[in-house]
Amino acid sequence: MGSLKRIGIVLVVATLLLVMSASFMSNDILNRAIIIGLGLDLAWDNQLVVTAEVVSPGNGSEQVGTFSKTITVTGQTVAQAIGLITQKMGKEASLGQCALLMLGQSLYTKVDFSQIVDFFIHSYNFKESSVICCAKGEAKDLLNQGEAMSQSVSLAIISTLQQQAKNIALPTNSLLQYARSQKELSGTGYINRVQFVSSDNADPQNPNKTQGYFAYNRLVVFCKNKFVDVLDDELVAGLSLLTQKVTGDVFIVQAGGEKITFITGEKKVDIGIVDTQVQLNVQLKCRLARTDDFGTNGSLTVQTEEDLPPELFEQIKIQAEELVQKLVNYQQMHNVDLIGLHEKFRQRDGSTQFANSFAMGDVTFSIQVKVKQN
């Protein structure tokens, strides 16, 4: 009987603790401004303009439910700006759920932003796996396009760059991956660029509402957190071909006067080194696009894989080799390493002076692409 009483007391205490914990968590969330995306721009006087997309449960005179809004403050440092967000909203600004860091053009093209990257990397509350991206224009303007997009800007960008990019031939970097690229060996790396593109308004109920979409087809190159250049479509395609985890590369070939679209379904990339020669070997498995928008009147839908002549895959091979060669030429011209060659040499030779600091013009390249049906 005594043991039953003791068990009963333990259960009562456990229940009370759970209730108190739930109450605390509820109040804790209610009193916080949960930041899901941060945008950083540079003001004319070199102060930071920080825009936060905030999710906060409504209380008091605010609307009922959870909603997002943006708030912009100006400060001398990121830490000061976050403190100002707390003051303005009357709620503690929380970075624990923030998964997007967006750099505005006024910032990343003009200054060395190493201190900003270090601040977030060494923050206990900020996720190292967060998405980092650059804005075409000001980050503040992009983060305020929620109404035009009819959704949270931060969540839309995070979804594309974290989940969908690997299937649409778009190389990406997390905050940690980018930060490491700027600290180690060649000190070069890239960040995805996001641009808002206006489109025609198709909503008769709100004829004056701005509508549009985000374009992701550019990468910005940095060396030790200083702006170098923006990669165009062909250079992005070349980098995608040399990125193992990325598929969805698109090729358009011609047969019988028609244009036919192929998509990469599987890929194997091998980067070998012999002396100072880099051997780039890419194996692609490509399939026909399920639909084609190039005026073939649906003729592809009746074509089976067995009907495809090898000449089509030879065209893909030539296109892929040309794209990779353009990326190689670009890296040598600008002396940037976007495919981790310095790390390859370090793995082979150890931390030698050559492996740590060779110029891209000091090595030669051979390129081989093989294409098969998927």
What are these regions (language model features)?
Residues 2-374:
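Membrane-proximal alpha-helical signals and transmembrane carboxylates
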